[in-house]
Every structure is written in structure tokens, then in C-alpha cells.
């Protein structure tokens, strides 16, 4: 049975075993129940104070925060004020009428003043009490222990404990499900129950799970006899009983339920517990004891990591709220909690493990740097999980890469530890095979002609309306003369490419975009005009009442040479519905790209990731790009654009993550290299998003291009990035050489750069201050005829 259970666990969780780094807060050890095995509950005479003070709690939580704890486990006796005068008087003195009211206050302070997330074990609760605690906790729990009324009869362990009546506990679990609370429950074995009663208890929990879907984990806890209790001499369940119960629980709940056994209660036999089907060790504290089982100290995380690895599994930290609930946080978390959880997690719903942020200028975390170095050591053996090994083997051929499914690609994005190193190694080897040791860059200039936009993209800190001047400056709409001046200046400074995009000004039409191209072509006849996202093209065609193909032909005739594949964000309409609901949808974006390719306009392809998306949406995006490229061959490169959060409206509203982790950012480049094997050879790393060190890391994870010098970069800086507005050719070449590669200046379409322009770029004078013409009610003229061409 354990063999089947273990296989089920592997189906659901692969090689990952999780734990939560927590601190244990016994808010009160007074309790009205008298469980015969319990040493947690104390009488007032044995306690210095009825309750921990807020200051004591915060002091411990801040120490736990310093030690890397992400969970504050509040455990307390049930309704002590109904039994003890000391509890009632203490609550009255603090200004509270009940223990749970005080608990809500304390947990709220922890949530507001620290980065640690409260998990609350408050016992049996009413609907009103659950509603009181939901806004101050990421998750809650109550051990069912048993569904057998027999264990509450005289002489049995729950006799005299009104809160241990199974119906009351099941009612609380049911209420929590109705309130959409991520919830923990489980059973306690070895307290006099039969195997049949264990199964009946697990089936009762499964019934509630089928009704609400809120049980994030099931704990199988083995009884430990404790001196000084009525059950001090009772026999403890042996290992065979524990293994049997874990295995039967896995069979009852299936592959996807997280199944936990506390490691401190079974020292020396952890491999047997893994073999029985668990995938989680529960909370492990680096600082506080297990107050419920004080005789059983927590194992050190380092030792737990080693013992887990000996079973062929990777130990990984999780939050108190499990990944699948984080990924649907709008449903499962109160708004007050959701923002705190999203700030802590990655795209899988696991905790961020370092302080690196896109665009922040912070150095690379040692952990990821070490894994990347390990990937580059080809002789270093890697312990690769079977799922990753299978997908990497398929991706090694063009045909196999073209057949990778969304599920296959999700597996690659979930890679951690040795799996992460293996994916980066495979991508780097493929990069070497397809592109050699050169890294290319282009001398170009960004010209963002307006930051006025009538679209309401939730991530955008660049576009300006009348309410956003206090964030990033005043709305502007460049005149034709300023556009022309910037283009001429760019050419004189060695640029071969002019890259133009902007907001969708409500007064702009397709003629506006045609006028911009005419102005640029008159000013700089020799420059490559790389302009207009699919959104601008779609809007331009609509306003002129012509087809996409006709409008694109007009743009091309006016002098447009190629197009950026921006406005893609995430090509998954479930994400776009919240991220950019009024923007073109996935099918429309792909339609513009295909039409562009059909009229002979090459384009880039992009992804903007790390906000409200997940690995499935990333995979869908890559598949959409790959499949279109197989039809048209029109994409020149793929450009991952990690989300910069700090000034983004959706992040400031608490509805998005803080951008991808470094692991995720590197994997996006690596996985793209593998998925686009034989279809898109150029994978570009964005220096304005990743920074110099980040770009160099990407060059060892599948990237072969570092983009453009830019001269003026405003969109990413508006979102809060700190990496500057221009990267000179000399700086690019220093960056590339330091990464052990050879620099190759290029043009937009990946041919060699013009030597004359490159000489100009190396001797470029400082930029003149740009003039951002203030926006007025109507658009400014974009066509001028009295221009003296510079090239």
C-alpha cells in the first residue's frame, strides 16, 4: 500500500518535499478542555500571565523574522474565559471581551508590523469569529483528531472536553470552507481509536474537502505519551501504524492533497514516512519549542534537508498558505492579507528566498549564483528529477522542442536546485550550438512620443492621465519637431535603429502613425525605423477603417522597417482580463503579428512576466509564439521583460507580486531557448530590467543578445527601475567580455552593424536634454516638411 501511496505522492509533488519556517506563539495556555494526553494546557497558578502581551508577541515575531521565519503559528487553549476568572479579568483589563477578539487584535498587529504571516489554530469557531480572524490570517486550522464520539465517553481521552465533540469540530471546518479560508486539519493516532475510526475520520474530512476545496493539508500526527498526564503510561503507536495511516490517507485524498507528518515526533525514521506518501514536514522553528510536544525538539533545517535528500527529494520552504491557494489569492485571501502574501511569493506560490528585485540594482543572491555556476561545470553531476530529465531530453531535438506541451513547459519553469542547474545548462549548451560565443547588441534610440493613454492597463506606470502626475511626471505629447530632433541626434550619435512606441492618445488615428514614420524618414533616411506595437497598429487600422494588412502596407510604404512585439504582456486571456482588460486580446495580438509578417515586416516577440501570472500562463505564451513562428518565421528575437513592480499601480494596490525571482527570470531565458529550438535563435536579455550582473547571468542561461543602447529609456524607469537610460557600446562590450563572450555590434535584423555608424557611436557626445512637450487637449502635429535630412 505504501508503494502505491508513494507513487501517488510523486505524481502530485514530484521530488519536492516542503516545510514552513515558523515560530510558535502560545498566546494563552489556559483552556477549558481537559484532554487526557495534553501538557499544553495549564492552570492559572502555573502561568505567570494569562496571555502573552502584544509586545511579547511582536518581540518574538521580529526575532523570527530575522531568522527567516515566514509563519507565526498562533496556538491557544479553547475559550479559557468560560472556565477561568483569571482569563476574564485579563481580557477585561486589556479591553477585550473574548480570547478570539484579543487574538484578532494581536494577529492584526503582526500582519501590519512585520513580514511574517499569521496562521491561527483557534479551536472551534462560529461564522462571526471566522469572519473576524480571516482579515488578519493567511490560513487557519483545527485538528479534527477523530470523528469518533466513542473517544469522548467516560474513561476515554476526550471525556470532559466540550470542544472535542467531533460534530463541533467538523462544523468549524465546514464553516471555514464556506468562508473560503485555507485550512489545515488532520487526525491524531494512537489515542484509543481503531483503524476503522481513522478511516472514517479521514473520509469525513474528504467529504468537507469535496464540498469546499479548502483543506490545504492533512496532518497525520502520532500520539506521544507525556509525563504528568492521564495517558502517561499509554502505549504509543508503532511505526507500522503510522506508515499504514499515512498511506491510507494518501489513497483516500489522492495525488494533489498535501500530506504532513511532524518530523520531531518520529526522529530516526523520516525515510519511512516519505516512503509512505507524505510530501510535507509541517512547521519547523529555528527558535521556539513545540509547546504541544515539548519533549520533541524540532530537527535543524540543515539536517532535515540532508535526510530528505537521502530519499531522493528536495526540501523547499513554503508559506503557511499553500501554493494552489496563493495562485487563486483573490478567492482565498482577504484583501488585507493578499497583498502581504503576494509580496512574499513567486509564480508558483512558493516564498521568495532572497531580496533580489527586477530593476532594483541589487546584487545577485549567492544561492542562485551558486546554482548557475554549478550548471556551467559540465563535469559536475546533477541529481535531476525524472520529470525534468524527460522534458530536457525531448527539447534536445528541433522536432521534440516543437512538440513540447504547455504541461511540459510548466515542468521546466518549476525547476529548482539541481533541476534549475540542469535547465540552465541545457539552454546554455543549445545557445552555444545555435549562436556560438558571440553576444550581439544594437546602437539605437528609444523615442516615446507620448505618455498619454486612454487604455487602463493595471501594470503601467508610464502612461499618464490627470490623476497620475504625482507619480512620474506630467503628461506629454511630442511635437514633430522634437521627434525629428531626437531622431537626427540619434543618427549623429551612431544609432542605426529608431525604436518608437507610446501611449494610445485619444486623439491619435492611423494617420498619426503614418505621419510619424514620414517625419522620421525625412529626418533620417538611412535609419531603420522599428516602431509601433500591435496595439497601436490595431488602433490605427480601426480609426482609418481599413484592414490590418492595408494599414501595415501603408506603414511599410511610408518607411516602416520592422515592429516591436510589445503589448503582448501575457498571451493568456484569463490573465489579461485583470491585467489589461481593455487591451487587444491574445488572438488579436497574434493576428497583428501574423499580418505584419505576411506583408514583410519582421517583428520581435516579448513577454512581460512576474505579476499576477503563473507558470501555466507563461507556458501558454511561449507555445503561442512558437506556433506562430513555425507558420511565418517572422520573429527576429524573443525578449523576456521581467515585471518592475515598485511604481506599478497593480502592485501598489496589493494585487500583484513584486516581479519574478532571479530564478524565474533566468528560467524564462533558459526555457525560451529550449522551447524555441530551431524556430527563434536570438534570446535577448534586458539590461534595464536585469541590470549588468543579471544580464551576465542570463548569458549563461541561454541568452545571446543584450538589446540596445536605448539613449532614452522611460517606460521601465517610470515603473521604478534604477539601471539608467543608456548603455554605451564600450559598456556593452565590457559587460560581454566580462561574461567570457565576444561582442558583436549588429543592426535590427541581426546583420553586422555599419562600421561608420559604429565609429560615431564610440565617439558620441552627451545627449541634449529632451523636451517633453506638455500634452494639450488635442494631439500635436506629427508631420513636418521643412526638415533637413541628416542621413
Model-assigned labels for residue ranges:
Residues 1-36, 40-51, 55-56, 60, ...:
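N-terminal [4Fe-4S]-dependent radical SAM core
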Residues 9, 17, 21, 31-32, ...:
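Mobile, glycine- and charge-enriched loop segments
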Residues 19-23, 72-74, 118-120, 140-142, ...:
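Hydrophobic faces of well-ordered beta-strands that scaffold small-molecule active sites
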Residues 1-3, 10-12, 58, 65, ...:
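Auxiliary Fe-S-binding modules of radical SAM enzymes
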Residues 5, 35, 74, 142, ...:
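Conserved, mostly hydrophobic/aromatic
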Residues 29-31, 39, 76-78, 144-148, ...:
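Short, small-residue-rich loop/turn micro-motifs
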Residues 44-210, 394, 464-627:
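Conserved Radical SAM active-site core
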Residues 21-26, 118-122, 189-192, 260-263, ...:
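Conserved short loop/turn motifs at secondary-structure junctions
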Amino acid at each position: 500500500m505504501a508503494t502505491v501511496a508513494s507513487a501517488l505522492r510523486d505524481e502530485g509533488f514530484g521530488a519536492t518535499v516542503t516545510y514552513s519556517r515558523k515560530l510558535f506563539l502560545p498566546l494563552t495556555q489556559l483552556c477549558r478542555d481537559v484532554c487526557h494526553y495534553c501538557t499544553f494546557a495549564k492552570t492559572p497558578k502555573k502561568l505567570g500571565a494569562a496571555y502573552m502581551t502584544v509586545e511579547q508577541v511582536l518581540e518574538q515575531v521580529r526575532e523570527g523574522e530575522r531568522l527567516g521565519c515566514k509563519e507565526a503559528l498562533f496556538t491557544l487553549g479553547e475559550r479559557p474565559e468560560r472556565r477561568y476568572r483569571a482569563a476574564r479579568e485579563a481580557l477585561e483589563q486589556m479591553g477585550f471581551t473574548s480570547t478570539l477578539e484579543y487574538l484578532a487584535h494581536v494577529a492584526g498587529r503582526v500582519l501590519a508590523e512585520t513580514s511574517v504571516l499569521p496562521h491561527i489554530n483557534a479551536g472551534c469557531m462560529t461564522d462571526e469569529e471566522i469572519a473576524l480572524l480571516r482579515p488578519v490570517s493567511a490560513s487557519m486550522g483545527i485538528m479534527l483528531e477523530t470523528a469518533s464520539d466513542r473517544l469522548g465517553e467516560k474513561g476515554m481521552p476526550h471525556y470532559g472536553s466540550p470542544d472535542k465533540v467531533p460534530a463541533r469540530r467538523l462544523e468549524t471546518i465546514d464553516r471555514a470552507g464556506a468562508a473560503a479560508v485555507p485550512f489545515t486539519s488532520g487526525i491524531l493516532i494512537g489515542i484509543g481509536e481503531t483503524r476503522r475510526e481513522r478511516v472514517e475520520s479521514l473520509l469525513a474530512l474528504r467529504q468537507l474537502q469535496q464540498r469546499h476545496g479548502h483543506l490545504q493539508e492533512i496532518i497525520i500526527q502520532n500520539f506521544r505519551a507525556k509525563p504528568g498526564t492521564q495517558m502517561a503510561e499509554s502505549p504509543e503507536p508503532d511505526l507500522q501504524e503510522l506508515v499504514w495511516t499515512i498511506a491510507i490517507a494518501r489513497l483516500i485524498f489522492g495525488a494533489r492533497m498535501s500530506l504532513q507528518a511532524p518530523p520531531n515526533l518520529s526522529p530516526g525514521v523520516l525515510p519511512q514516512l516519505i516512503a509512505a506518501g507524505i510530501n510535507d514536514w509541517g512547521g519547523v522553528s529555528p527558535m521556539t519549542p513545540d509547546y504541544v510536544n515539548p519533549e520533541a525538539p524540532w530537527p535543524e533545517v540543515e539536517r532535515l534537508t540532508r535526510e530528505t535528500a537521502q530519499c531522493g527529494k528536495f526540501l523547499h520552504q513554503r508559506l503557511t498558505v499553500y501554493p494552489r491557494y496563493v495562485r487563486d489569492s483573490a478567492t482565498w485571501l482577504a484583501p488585507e492579507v493578499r497583498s502581504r502574501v503576494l509580496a512574499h511569493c513567486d509564480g508558483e506560490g512558493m516564498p521568495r528566498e532572497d531580496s533580489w528585485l527586477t530593476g532594483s540594482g541589487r546584487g545577485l543572491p549567492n544561492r542562485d549564483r551558486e546554482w548557475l555556476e554549478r550548471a556551467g561545470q559540465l563535469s559536475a553531476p546533477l541529481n535531476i528529477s525524472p520529470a525534468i530529465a524527460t522534458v530536457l531530453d525531448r527539447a534536445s531535438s528541433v522536432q521534440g522542442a516543437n512538440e513540447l506541451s504547455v504541461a511540459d513547459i510548466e515542468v521546466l519553469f518549476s525547476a529548482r536546485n539541481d533541476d534549475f542547474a540542469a535547465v540552465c545548462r541545457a539552454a546554455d549548451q543549445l545557445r552555444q550550438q545555435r549562436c556560438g560565443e558571440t553576444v550581439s547588441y544594437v546602437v539605437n534610440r528609444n523615442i516615446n512620443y507620448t505618455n498619454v493613454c486612454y487604455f487602463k492597463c493595471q501594470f503601467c506606470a508610464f502612461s499618464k492621465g490627470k490623476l497620475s502626475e504625482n507619480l512620474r511626471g506630467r503628461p506629454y505629447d511630442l511635437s514633430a519637431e522634437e521627434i525629428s530632433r531626437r531622431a537626427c541626434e540619434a543618427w549623429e550619435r551612431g544609432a542605426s535603429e529608431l525604436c518608437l512606441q507610446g501611449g494610445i492618445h485619444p486623439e491619435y488615428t492611423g494617420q498619426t502613425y503614418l505621419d510619424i514614420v514620414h517625419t522620421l524618414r525625412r529626418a533620417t533616411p538611412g535609419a531603420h525605423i522599428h516602431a509601433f506595437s500591435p496595439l497601436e497598429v490595431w488602433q490605427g487600422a480601426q480609426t482609418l477603417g481599413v484592414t490590418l494588412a492595408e494599414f501595415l502596407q501603408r506603414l511599410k510604404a511610408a518607411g516602416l522597417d520592422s515592429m516591436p512585439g510589445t503589448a503582448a504582456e501575457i498571451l493568456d486571456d484569463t490573465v489579461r482580463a485583470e491585467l489589461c482588460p481593455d487591451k487587444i486580446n491574445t488572438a488579436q495580438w497574434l493576428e497583428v503579428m501574423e499580418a505584419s509578417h505576411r506583408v514583410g515586416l519582421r517583428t520581435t516577440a516579448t513577454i512581460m512576466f512576474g505579476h499576477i501570472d503563473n507558470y501555466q500562463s507563461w507556458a501558454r505564451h511561449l507555445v503561442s509564439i512558437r506556433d506562430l513562428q513555425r507558420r511565418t518565421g517572422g520573429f527576429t528575437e524573443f525578449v523576456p521583460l521581467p515585471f518592475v513592480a515598485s511604481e506599478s499601480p497593480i502592485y501598489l494596490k496589493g494585487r500583484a507580486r513584486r516581479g519574478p525571482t532571479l530564478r524565474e527570470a533566468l528560467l524564462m531565458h533558459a526555457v525560451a531557448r529550449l522551447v524555441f529550438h530551431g524556430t527563434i535563435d536570438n534570446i535577448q536579455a534586458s539590461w534595464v530590467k536585469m541590470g549588468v550582473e543579471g544580464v551576465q547571468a542570463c548569458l549563461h542561461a541561454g541568452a545571446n543578445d543584450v538589446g540596445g543602447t536605448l539613449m532614452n529609456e522611460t517606460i521601465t524607469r517610470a515603473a521604478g527601475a534604477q539601471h539608467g537610460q543608456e548603455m554605451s557600446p564600450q559598456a556593452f562590450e565590457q559587460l560581454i567580455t566580462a561574461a567570457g563572450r565576444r561582442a558583436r555590434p549588429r543592426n535590427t535584423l541581426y546583420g553586422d552593424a555599419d562600421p561608420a555608424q559604429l565609429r560615431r557611436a564610440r565617439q558620441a557626445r552627451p545627449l541634449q536634454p529632451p523636451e517633453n512637450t506638455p500634452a494639450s487637449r488635442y494631439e500635436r502635429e506629427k508631420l513636418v516638411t521643412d526638415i533637413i535630412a541628416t542621413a
